[in-house]
Amino acid sequence: SYTSAQGDTAVRAKIAGSIEERFGFPANKDLIYMTCGAAASLTVTLNALINSGDEIIIPSPFFPEYRVFAENAGARVVTVQCRKPDFQLDIKATENAVTEKTKAIIINSPNNPTGAVFSPDTIKALSDMLCKKQAEYGTDIYIIADEPYRELSYGAEVPYIPKYYANTVICYSYSKSLSLPGERIGYIFIPEGAADCRKLYAAVCGAGRALGFVCAPSLMQYTVAECTDALPDVSAYKKNRDLLFGALTDYGYEAVPPDGAFYLFVKSPEPDANAFCEKAKKYEL
């Protein structure tokens, strides 16, 4: 049967309890909104936050749908290249991209497609910079933390961003952590320390209704409630990572070993990456 539009109360309470236990961070069930996965979480969050003409900063390389989600919400997308070769955030370049129109920056760590995990020092520097820019412009700037790969780390610490920066919105999906891609279940979490957290949560609820994301699948809500603290065994992913990275670099390809997720971001050996990909497809590589 249907749950409430924002999700079953008991399910949200279990998720809030898990956040508090795992990360040592206070979470209120009444600021958690169940969604049809991370894509819905991002779409709803962006539509709740964005006014036409607002700017969204996206570190590059990035999951291509971010641009679609942001522009569909009426935002202007501003991309900032990550630092090479480690693909950590370039804090100075990000600071230069912030304007009085900046509403949010999307942070995806572990990252799709690079596999980079943004370090605690990186997140602390980002937080300090955004606090400074908020004070300079007298505006609220949010971090939208897209976290479907949070549990897929090969030993690198994955900072829990709300502990570093109050104006954070968590967009979480269980599809990767529970190996349930396609089951479409996740949540939005707004910390109580975020600016106008209750109004923002009301906007999230309203955006969910307007976009047709009313009541995430009930069966999957009850399923994840029994798995809130389940962590994946990443040993198979790590074995594949080591095998592919070793073989490809032995062949002369350039790549950085990913610290998380399950992607290997390989530099094209030709100037035209699309042309190289077409050749690779031809030979079934």
Positions of PLM-derived features:
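PLP-dependent class I/II
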Residues: S1, Q6, A10-A13, G17-L285
